[in-house]
Amino acid sequence: MSDVQERLHILLDYWIEHNSEHEKEFRDWAEKAASLSTEAAQLLQKAATKMVAVGNDLMKAREALTKEMEGH
């Protein structure tokens, strides 16, 4: 395994966890914002949903890297 592969694997694990934390935080704040601004709450929920999609792509990238590492 190259240094770049090893570093990327570590970063992907970190980014996946970090992204998940942000998604949860956005949803928490959307609930709090609901009484202040429906639009703000909806936009925070929308951002959280996008974070889920980002997380899915990060997991797919990690899986692809893992497959590549196992293949060599």
PLM regions with names:
Residues 69-72:
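Short acidic DE-rich linear segments
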Residues 32-67:
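Short, charge-rich amphipathic interface segments used for partner binding and complex assembly
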Residues 2-30:
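N-terminal acidic leader/helix
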